[in-house]
Amino acid sequence: MLRAAIAFFIIAIVAYIFGASGVAGMSVEIGRILLFVFLALAIISFVINLVSGRKP
């Protein structure tokens, strides 16, 4: 699960970079949405990993 959290975090950062670079007006909104979606998934995965107590 920790690997999934890290993967979601990296995807969130990449989505933000593409969205914030100003390629197109719509890409900014899409990048922001993807940032929050994947950041939320990363946090959820990390919390589940902490609660379950299993090692990755």
Curated annotation (Swiss-Prot):
One of its GO terms (cellular component) is plasma membrane. It comes from the Bacteria. The chain crosses the membrane at residues 4-24, 33-53. InterPro entries: DUF1328. Keywords: Cell membrane, Membrane, Transmembrane, Transmembrane helix. Pfam families: DUF1328 (PF07043). It is a multi-pass membrane protein. The keyword Acyltransferase does not apply. Belongs to the UPF0391 family. This is UPF0391 membrane protein Bd1438.
